[in-house]
Amino acid sequence: MTEKELLRIASAEIGTKENPAGSNKVKYNTWYYGRAVSGKAYPWCMVFVQWVFDRAGIAVPIKTASCGALLNAAKSKGQAVKGGYRPGDVVIYDFDGNGSTDHCGIVEAVNDKLITAIEGNTGSTNNADGGQVQRRTRNVSAVVGAWRPVYREVQTMTTDEAKKIIMDKAGLDAYTIQFLGAYKYGEELMVKLAQAMK
């Protein structure tokens, strides 16, 4: 799955709220814990991230409800980054700069010194524990690091490049390639075949 596909899953959740407000009772916690839970012991910003990646079929470095534990696991697997954030990264925030991890989100866009992320358990008047999924824009200086997942790459290839690869690797002649290209989706098929052979 690509970053864009994952972000579509996350953005479809914007507006989901815990019920009742302030309870941490939300579908992501029910999925994660295997039962309905509520109370202050169940903040769910990281649980939301875990849920999104589960739906996308992308493995996380560790199953956890802790932002710090995810960042540490990402570091141990060589998948942590500090700076140069990009869409699809899971950023970890330290809002008060005390060295502890406070919150997380899935980066949707980066613009100069600002990051826009889709976050669980946030709200418009606070940084964390706000009770809903929202798109938030924050200063990059609040980020202590991020997990950079391994996404499937979307490769662009011209039809001519695809033809050459198929001819070289599959041993097909120019006539057969022309025949394939004549079908309704022939050029698209050739590009996909060539990408698989590459």
Name the predicted role of every residue range.
Residues 46-51, 156-198:
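Short, solvent-exposed alpha-helical surface patches in non-cytosolic proteins
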Residues 1-58, 150:
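N-terminal capping segments
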